[in-house]
Amino acid sequence: MAFTNEQLERYSRHIILKEVGVKGQKKLLNSSVLIIGAGGLGAPAALYLAAAGVGTIGIADADEVDLSNLQRQVIHATRDVGKPKVISAKESMEAINPDVTVKTYQTFVDSETIMDLIKDYDFIIDGTDNFPAKFLINDACVMAKKPFSHAGILRFQGQLMTYVPGEGPCYRCVFKDPPPKDAVPTCKQAGVIGAMGGVIGSLQAMEAIKYILGVGDLLTGYLLTYDALTMEFRKIKLPQHVKSCPVCGEHPTITELIDYEQAECDGVLYGMFGE
């Protein structure tokens, strides 16, 4: 494919990077990323992936824009309150970059729908706000051999890890099962600083871009944590592979997708390793 003059100007800051260049930008334009959740994490990830020229971006979310979302979900505006989040997100992404094809899925992602959703995408971003969804995404991606980025946010903290099939532990290797209902506070209960979604969601977009380009080191085998109050990042090395993992281990016991009881959340952290 040949770039138009407008594309050469639009992506010029990418093209001059030796890690990207013309070849890398073509990879981005020919790639596809699915974002599950158009909230605090999915919003900044979607904006940066659209700006980067990722050719096809899917976005799945069943919710509508609420006024309380606007403190952190920067893809939506006051005029969008009451509108389906996927439609609001699509409009914002297409306004940034007309090169991008945005596919919308206004649906709850569950064991019946997720495999069809993820099958045609190169990389998955978990921007969900509850543990049942996070474990479902992990299990589906492991079974479908799809790479994905996990993240969670709460108060002034965030965490991030990346799974690539055959290259490191999955989410269940680290956190075997969802916590009991009400054992971990939600953002609705405990709060979240709005910019935290921007920090962590942007890092998820970066992981997707690096994976597509095949450059740099991904967070495979590591959990990255961030504390905004102390301005500390910690990169925690995880077990390379847990042979007894119930989903990706040598003898998996989870061979079908599970719909756990849903608890209302809006950004979650699990097992912050003593933080």
Q: Which stretches of residues belong to each language-model region?
A:
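Adenine nucleotide-associated cytosolic modules
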Residues: 1-275
